[in-house]
Amino acid sequence: MAVLTAVDLTNASRYAIHMHRLEFISRWRTRFPHILIDYTLRPASSDDDYYVPPKLADKALAVKLAFSKRGCVSMSCYPFHETGVVSNTTPFMYMQTSETSVGYAQPACYHLDRAAAMREGAETQVQSAEFRYTLDNKCILVDSLSKMYFNSPYLRTEEHTIMGVDDVPAFNVRPDPDPLFPERFKGEFNEAYCRRFGRELFNGGCSFRWWESLIGFVLGDTIFVTFKMLANNIFSELRDFDYKAPSSILPPRPNVDSNAILAQWRSVRDNATDLEFEKLFNKNPTLNDLGMIVNGSPVQITYTAETGFTKTPIAYNYRGNERARVEHFEALDRSISDQDLESIITSFLEDYALVFGIATDIGFDMLMSGFKSMLKKINTSLIPAMKHMLLSTTRRVTVRMLGETYKAALVHSLNVIAIKTLTVTAKALTRIAIQASSIVGIVLILLTLADLVLALWDPFGYNNMFPREFPDDMSRTFLTAYFESFDNTTSREIIEFMPEFFSEMVETDDDATFESLFHLLDYVASLEVNSDGQMLNLEEGDEIEDFDESTLVGQALATSSLYTRMEFMQYTFRQNTLLSMNKENNNFNQIILGLFATNTIVAFTAFVIHTELIFFIFFVIFLMITFYYIIKESYEYYKTIDLLF
């Protein structure tokens, strides 16, 4: 009997992802009307997106959802101030540790979900990261760590006592204008920094004037710099060093009304939105419903925040191509029952080669025990949601159709988990959470940047610290370490953040799973031929209207968490082999044990009769040897088990 292949299951998941993204647009509008978004809708392509069954050609979409330029700015959060990390009570302010003002604690840090931010234990759990909108219309994650290092000298070290490293004015910081490196921040010397080391800002670097170089040559640079710093009142500033105002020649930091900034952030609205049109997204619309068929030709709809809609003709064939069929001789069993639904799910879960192979393709790399544990958690929520979906749908559902939908839903769940845990974006969010949790977290991140050779830093500034290339070289080193901290590959990937990465603030996982099941059922029911060319005939057979979810969950958990028959046979074979080997190695144990037991009794009897010490010593020795041979066989068995497992 033909079933969905791994290719079909993956395509079903892709279809569900795009259709869920379509519904997510209106949910985002409801939850975050002040965070503006752009989106693009186009008919799905079998070549570029996923296989489109002919029955779905009039509704299969490819949806792209992204932050607009203003939305990207609204989502940005820089979580560091002069001496630490922001908390859930830190107001938005500017710091002026250099000639460049830097804002921190933007509203997105803790006001995306204010209730969650104020819970106990969430004081330092920032809800967003720092983003930048690029020329190619992407909201990307930037390297906030290098910005922090350039702008907050206090955070460079843990003890804050290293002269010339953390008791200095900051570098001027600005985003790199090079479009090839949009994530990077560039550091630049300023007059206050150069003055701290008895130098002048010249041509982008810190240097002596020509006549100061002559005096330094005669007196020695150390002596000359000491006198110059004394004349410039540097030592008195260092005695009462203020990390928030590190130099008297820096401008004062800007004053800002943080409450007004927060109110302005919340009051943003997109007046170009067509809410009536977007309500269609939750009604399983067709291309005609969305106005994507103009004069009989398909078009792509692009919405730009605060601007409106544009329609662009598409050149590819959006209509699903019918797959080639091969002769299939297996007859359909028309006596399918509720018991067979259990068989479908159980046999699928026991086919670890297929399921584990799909998970590996998605990106999971774990032991089989860890994979089974994940399957157990998925099934606990997936099967009840599947029953809820079955009772809610108006479609006629057969047992095989529901069984194949379960398989697709399991693969889809793996895809969703992978997006949240394995992607570069997920790793970036984890890294941000560690950085923003405490100063210790910052130090730990710095220690992991193996390519950041801090040995080049000269604390007293006599060698490598002042050429104008120095901040730029350090910025490039930070950027290299920034990418290498995400994975061990040499690939460089710009990390684009999209609204769906914040889905946990918009919907629960259970709701998302339930809604996705309807899309998966639609896709599975629309498939007539699998990727191998076999006829599926999923609509043939008895209809299923309900099933015992408790029994099915128990069956699935047992299958995905306990041993299969093959694993059990392998386990018992190993145990029998160990027992046999252990017995062969201890063939004469009983004879030796009997001899030493007899000697023990004889020695004890002699000691009682003659009361001489030598007999007591023999008695103790024989007793210890007898005890050893009693436990020898068991000891060697468990020792072998410990070494092997």
Swiss-Prot record:
Assembly, per entry: Interacts with the PIF complex composed of PIF1, PIF2 and PIF3.
GO biological process entries: viral life cycle
Lineage, uppermost ranks: Viruses, Viruses incertae sedis, Naldaviricetes, Lefavirales, Baculoviridae
Transmembrane segments: 437-457, 590-610, 611-631
Keyword Disulfide bond attributed: no
Keywords: Membrane, Secreted, Transmembrane, Transmembrane helix, Viral occlusion body, Virion, Virulence
UniProt similarity note: Belongs to the baculoviridae p74 family.
Protein task: Plays an essential role for oral infectivity of occlusion-derived virus (ODV) and also functions in host midgut attachment and fusion by binding to a specific host receptor.
Major site of localization recorded for this protein: secreted
Topology in the lipid bilayer: Multi-pass membrane protein
Protein's name in the database: Per os infectivity factor 0
Protein location: Secreted; Virion membrane
A GO-annotated cellular component: membrane
Matching InterPro entries: Baculo_p74, Baculo_p74_N
Pfam family, one: Baculo_p74
